[in-house]
Amino acid sequence: MNNYISGATTAIITPFKNGTLDEATYANLIQRQIDNNIDAICPVGTTGESATLSHDEHKRCIEIAVEVCKGSNAKVLAGAGSNATHEAIDIAKHAEACGVDALFSVSPYYNKPSQEGLYQHYKAIASAVEVPFMLYNVPGRTGVDILPDTVKRLFDDVWNIMGIKEATGSIERTVELLAKVPDLYVFSGDDSIDFPILASGGKGITSVTANLLPDMKADLTHAALRGDFKTSKAINDELFEINKVLFCESNPIPIKAAMYIAGLIDTLEYRLPLVPPSSENMKKIENVMKKYKIVGA
């Protein structure tokens, strides 16, 4: 399999209007990413509020992403996660039928499977499709960590498992993964450490901040992948403050607020139990956007 995704990918938000998916705005957001050299769109992940979307909404988000990206250089790396394996398989099969380029799947949350359970879960989902497949490890949100030995076992045993989005916040984890699985495609899942992960051998990033600043995230990633670490680090350093502010509350609360302030979405709507930022944090977001001279701030 030689059609792996690498580079800068965006964990796209899901805009709502009057409680429903705002399809027109969603399509516009994706097109903006394409216009700013993002390599792939990642719909219906954590940032896309997948946990509170209906299955029909989840599938529609993927359909729109494929429609908008068709004919462009941008690929679709779609979310197919669930803590019920059969549901994840259903989503994955639908996404494949829509024409996505690859899939990522968050580790099962709440039910906390063992490493053997994680192995069987991912083996079942990836084996149900024939597109490249990425694990998504974010133990701070799911309560379970996909350990490197389990990643290696999956990589060795399942032909289309090609990588992992690593959101442990640990650079050492990336180093360990690549020591054990040199051909693994590791993607940074933490905006503040994109450069260190790329410099350690990572093949890409999946960014929240790219919703707002896709051009800078694309430049950071592409510089690192061509070996221009000086440029990549300089951009990573420049983005450090806004990266931190955009995680002042649970993702995607701050990034959606920032997108609203910037005029990129029409309404600031979340699905309960998520609610808008506190007034104190909203002020932080407004201030950092002014500092970065982002339109609308």
Curated annotation (Swiss-Prot):
Q: What does this protein do?
A: Catalyzes the condensation of (S)-aspartate-beta-semialdehyde [(S)-ASA] and pyruvate to 4-hydroxy-tetrahydrodipicolinate (HTPA).
An example molecular function term from Gene Ontology annotations: 4-hydroxy-tetrahydrodipicolinate synthase activity
InterPro entries in the cross-refs: Aldolase_TIM, DapA, DapA-like, Schiff_base-form_aldolases_AS
What is the protein named? Answer: 4-hydroxy-tetrahydrodipicolinate synthase
Q: Where in the cell is it found?
A: Cytoplasm
Query: Does Amino-acid biosynthesis show up as a keyword for this record?
Result: yes
Gene for this chain: dapA
Looking at its record, which EC class is this enzyme? lyase
Q: Name one GO cellular component term.
A: cytosol
Q: How does it assemble?
A: Homotetramer; dimer of dimers.
The record's CDD domains line, in alphabetical order, gives:
DHDPS
Q: Pathway membership of this protein?
A: Amino-acid biosynthesis; L-lysine biosynthesis via DAP pathway; (S)-tetrahydrodipicolinate from L-aspartate: step 3/4
Native source organism of the sequence:
Sulfurovum sp. (strain NBC37-1)
UniProt keyword list: Amino-acid biosynthesis, Cytoplasm, Diaminopimelate biosynthesis, Lyase, Lysine biosynthesis, Schiff base
Query: Where does this protein chiefly localize?
Result: cytoplasm
Q: Which GO terms describe its biological process?
A: diaminopimelate biosynthetic process; lysine biosynthetic process via diaminopimelate
Q: Which reaction does it catalyse?
A: L-aspartate 4-semialdehyde + pyruvate = (2S,4S)-4-hydroxy-2,3,4,5-tetrahydrodipicolinate + H2O + H(+)
**What PANTHER family does the annotation carry?**
4-HYDROXY-2-OXOGLUTARATE ALDOLASE, MITOCHONDRIAL (PTHR12128:SF66), DIHYDRODIPICOLINATE SYNTHASE (PTHR12128)
